[in-house]
A protein has these predicted regions:
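Conserved acidic segment of CheY-like receiver
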Residues: 35-56, 89
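Conserved phosphotransfer microenvironments
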Residues: 87-108
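Two-component signal transduction core modules
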Residues: 89, 138-139
Length: 167
């Protein structure tokens, strides 16, 4: 049986009303080691929902199930990344007041062994900014579920295989 706890109980986020994933498996449960934790950041709940729905709970049959942690603020992203346990972060490049591209660059510069980061952008022409942001991959809105799941799976496979997340 899976033990459940709130995100706040895991010590990642203060209970300040941000919509995070309502519950996540407890660290002590054996199923946690098999799950992949994906942090999804956007100030807009509908963008977070679009990202999680496009990826689905299992982006590929050869990968473990995905457990999403949704956050709406930069402080929440920083707290989660500092706490560890995040296998992949997906950041909204259009988030306000701090966008995912600048946040990606900050995380890559400041965190040793930073987990892979995917940046979601609104315009295909903005993909070049991912190079500056040091993102490992880019998703373009509107999200195609096949492309989104494949991109996430490719990044996770590279990191699980001991290869750099960027191809």
């Amino acid at each position: 049986m899976l033990a459940w706890g709130t995100v706040a109980e895991r010590g990642w986020f203060p209970p300040d009303g941000h919509r995070c994933a309502d519950t996540v498996p407890s660290v002590s449960s054996p199923e946690v080691s098999a799950a992949t934790t994906v942090l999804v950041f956007s100030h807009r709940p509908e963008v977070r929902e679009a990202i999680t729905m496009a990826i689905g709970r299992r982006p590929a049959p050869d990968l473990p199930r995905v457990r999403f942690v949704e956050v709406g603020g930069v402080a929440d992203v920083l707290a989660a990344m500092d706490a560890g346990g995040v296998d992949l972060a997906i950041l909204d490049g259009e988030a306000q007041p701090t966008g995912g591209m600048g946040l990606s660059r900050q995380l890559k510069d400041e965190i040793t062994d930073c987990p892979p980061i995917i940046v979601a952008v609104r315009r295909r022409d903005d993909r070049w900014l991912a190079t500056w942001s040091q993102a490992d991959a880019v998703l373009v809105h509107p999200l195609d579920p096949l492309t989104a799941a494949e991109t996430v799976a490719d990044v996770l496979r590279r990191t699980r295989g001991g290869l750099p997340a960027r191809g």
